[in-house]
């Protein structure tokens, strides 16, 4: 089996980012983004997706977190697209429900080659630890556009905003793990009747 690893660098006037991933990892993670709450959520992706993930970012945090969060989503999406390659033999679809105390979220993903995001999370607060929760929409939109996936995110219940967000990211990691897993029964075939994705 070919290694499913990728490293991507993105440099703009707003951010300088390096992302390295191993889709067949064990959940090892290292983050240096300057945004601690974002690091905490990236750790959920790594641990629950069993994806080795290394993210470094120097961003214009003196303005706010927006460019850093969005550009990390973009760069992570690019790394996924590069690491997964032609998608032959993958399960393609992934889904997960994850609870955390009173909160419950569902994430469904399709490595379809068609970017689309439906995110329905009725946050009960505007920020957590000074982090603007609206920025998670920017993160996921960047990821979706560059990984070329369809992603549905629903927080089904919850009143603690931290719990709402954490269940979303844990479910996202688990849905990714399912979708990118190689299916031996596919025998390297494309998971589409079209013959391509």
From Swiss-Prot:
Which PROSITE patterns does the record match to this protein?
IGP_DEHYDRATASE_1, IGP_DEHYDRATASE_2
| Entry's localization field | Cytoplasm
What is a single molecular function from GO for this protein? imidazoleglycerol-phosphate dehydratase activity
* Primary localization: cytoplasm
Q: Please give the superkingdom of this protein's source.
A: Bacteria
Q: Please state the pathway this protein functions in, per its UniProt record.
A: Amino-acid biosynthesis; L-histidine biosynthesis; L-histidine from 5-phospho-alpha-D-ribose 1-diphosphate: step 6/9
Q: Which UniProt keywords apply?
A: Amino-acid biosynthesis, Cytoplasm, Histidine biosynthesis, Lyase
The UniProt entry, under InterPro entries, shows: IGPD_sf, ImidazoleglycerolP_deHydtase, ImidazoleglycerP_deHydtase_CS, Ribosomal_Su5_D2-typ_SF
An example of a Gene Ontology BP annotation on this entry? L-histidine biosynthetic process
Q: Does the keyword Amino-acid biosynthesis apply?
A: yes
A Pfam family this chain is assigned to:
IGPD
Look up the record and report any one GO term of the cellular component aspect. cytoplasm
Q: Which reaction does it catalyse?
A: D-erythro-1-(imidazol-4-yl)glycerol 3-phosphate = 3-(imidazol-4-yl)-2-oxopropyl phosphate + H2O
Q: Which HAMAP family match?
A: HisB (MF_00076)
What family does the Swiss-Prot or TrEMBL record give for this protein?
Belongs to the imidazoleglycerol-phosphate dehydratase family.
**What is the name listed in the Swiss-Prot or TrEMBL entry for this protein?**
Imidazoleglycerol-phosphate dehydratase
Q: What species is given as this protein's source?
A: Pseudomonas aeruginosa (strain ATCC 15692 / DSM 22644 / CIP 104116 / JCM 14847 / LMG 12228 / 1C / PRS 101 / PAO1)
Gene for this protein? hisB
